[in-house]
Swiss-Prot record:
Record-level Gene Ontology MF annotations: rRNA binding; structural constituent of ribosome
The protein's name in its UniProt record: Small ribosomal subunit protein uS19
NCBIfam families in alphabetical order: rpsS_bact
CC terms in the record's Gene Ontology section: cytoplasm; small ribosomal subunit
InterPro entries: Ribosomal_uS19, Ribosomal_uS19_bac-type, Ribosomal_uS19_CS, Ribosomal_uS19_SF
PROSITE patterns: RIBOSOMAL_S19
Job description of the protein: Protein S19 forms a complex with S13 that binds strongly to the 16S ribosomal RNA.
GO annotation, biological process: ribosomal small subunit assembly; translation
Gene label: rpsS
Length: 93
């Protein structure tokens, strides 16, 4: 169930402050955050936000197509190594 429109998008206050101060100064430094739950808003366009994936911070460059999505959608937490091959050549006897 999506969030109610009357509430507006959720974004952590500390992340919003960092974005606003960089917009006021006109700088585009990397913003490091653990807030995967924050929604991407138009004020974040052009910024690089390093989102924590549980192990390291993944740099995410915010584009116009990302507005409305969550930051955590762009920093994957699981790595798929692939299934074991199932043919006779790869089996050990």
């Amino acid at each position: 169930m999506p969030r109610s429109l009357k509430k507006g998008p959720f974004i952590d206050d500390h992340l919003l402050k960092k974005v606003e101060t960089q917009n006021d100064k006109g700088t585009k430094n990397v913003i490091k955050t653990w807030s995967r739950r924050s929604t991407i808003i138009p004020e974040m366009l052009g910024h690089t936000i390093a989102v924590h994936d549980g192990r390291k911070h993944v740099p995410v460059f915010v584009t116009e197509a990302m507005v409305g999505h969550k930051l955590g959608e762009f920093a994957l937490t699981r790595t798929f190594k692939g299934h074991e091959k199932d043919d006779r050549k790869s089996r050990r006897r």
